[in-house]
């Protein structure tokens, strides 16, 4: 259920609230809900419109673009972002070897370059300004700050063991996110000293592992055990046949979406192939020294329900020098119905079948190394394991703070086609010698936390507004992008619209879809805003702020922000550093350094 406003809040807002009457509207998209305030004024279309977009990722940039397109010369858009640099997950969430996906930045740069747009980087909603600060300064505020949290596995060891992190943070690490690399950002994990996420991931990927931690799975036959006994006794014949990856540590990735595939691909591909991409230099250095040679992708349901897209799956399955093993990808009659209903899933299954048919060329030896009379192949291994759920993350025998193995429960699917659910069977298997476990089971938006209280000077008795949040769905409740609030039955009940407040992107619909989906989403939200404007239902900015937006407030609070000119200086410096290294850019990984570069000459 959506959050319910307190009686005190309603008492302040209800005094002037009036449900709007009039002729019926053509569709629910155009029909305004009941309003929580009488702030709306009749605004002639020729008057300037001041808008604030909170978040400069794809959703925010598309929303700004649509506002500029619709309102033309009368629009002014201020864009706020907690990061010093714009473009959100296009910068920090797209894999470095997918440069074509990042080309959308060219369009977003055009939006930023528009003289009607101002950018305020390093200005966080809830930390530096509040919703209560913004709404009286603009005709409308569009929330586009996305999903900054993660869904969890809810298993023992997930929150306590070093080496267990979210895929979101891992992606941020190889993309140079300051939260992973900055010298001003530290983490503390289960008794470990404070260290950056980069240091933690480096320790996971490059630490020495003992052969006693060799992986063991449910198909660990007596013959396999016998071979290991011969290996331990030094049988040269069996050493000759031993796979190169037998002693290598494993990375386990929970989830079968495209983010999981990105993480697996970065871990498995030859790191030298990434040198000419915009991957963070520190992350590249770690990957080049990585001891991880095996990656296990774990999915709780079957191949017919997996979320990955065919193109990304084919790319992963066909990496050079990577053996592929697939477990429990058989399909039932009910699975066939799921496949029939989804062309992408059919194509994904075909990609798996084609890769299995090709097999692994055990005779192919790349980068042969002669050492003590044995041959070792410089190959890696990908295993895709369907119908498994994590049961526990277990510490190493020699280090109670560090991840050592993963226990999985085998699943079976129940239910009709289209709603098949995974149910545990009680049977388990263990993957040992696990250096890194990434959870990639979905992003999640968080409720806005306002860490300070600023007494309103323009309306001393006004209720301090926050952003409603539907914790069950992980979104800001809305109707076609109009932010709504559930009102207690004693106060009239129903869904009421919060005046002048709109939402777009993952914060609006949940964390799903591709970058292009945000354009459609932004068009819907801006369409609702325009419809409200046509009926005189936008806010009128308080005249005491002189149509200057949030800039004077940030200046008064002595907040060091990054303008679009400052961003251009950061961009130029990153490109300069990249050119020296033969790559598109070398991202700056410290907020403090970003601010220094942005303010040079400014």
Which sequence ranges carry the predicted segments?
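N-terminal mitochondrial targeting presequence
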Residues: 1-47, 211, 602
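Beta1/beta-strand and adjacent pyrophosphate-binding region of the FAD-binding site
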Residues: 46-57, 247-257
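N-terminal Rossmann-like FAD-binding beta1-loop-alpha1 element of flavoenzymes
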Residues: 50-73, 260-267
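Dinucleotide-binding/catalytic capping subdomain of oxidoreductase cores
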Residues: 71, 75-79, 261-428, 449, ...
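N-terminal Rossmann-like dinucleotide/flavin-binding domain of flavoprotein oxidoreductases
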Residues: 85-140, 348-377
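Feature captures the FAD/FMN-dependent oxidoreductase FAD-binding
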Residues: 108-160, 391-405
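Glycine-rich dinucleotide-binding loop and its adjacent helix/turn
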Residues: 150-289, 471-489
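C-terminal, flexible cofactor-proximal segment of oxidoreductases
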Residues: 486-490, 496-602
